[in-house]
């Protein structure tokens, strides 16, 4: 085998090994992300116990992250502002903010096709409301 073929074979082998490692890291990151999303738990927040104010909450699962600002007045969510939403294809999940305001609860259905982002946004809103609870 001449030197040129040998060099090409070495380069191809090195690229293959690098690709396998990168693929492994990617699959691990996806697995960790899905485990974090599946581990999210939700509590129904009683709005009659949330003090009036503006509260910020966030949820970060590594790949999908959301940060929100919730304004509460007279035991109602007056507004929910999405300050940050890093996602893959989860932009449609942002529609749950309107559902939460309309229904005055965080217990809304996830958006089909954007389930993980829906859960992350929902948890961020729940965390914001929790900050307004006494004690």
Regions found by a protein language model. Give the residues of each.
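Intrinsically disordered terminal and processing segments
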Residues: 1-67, 71-135
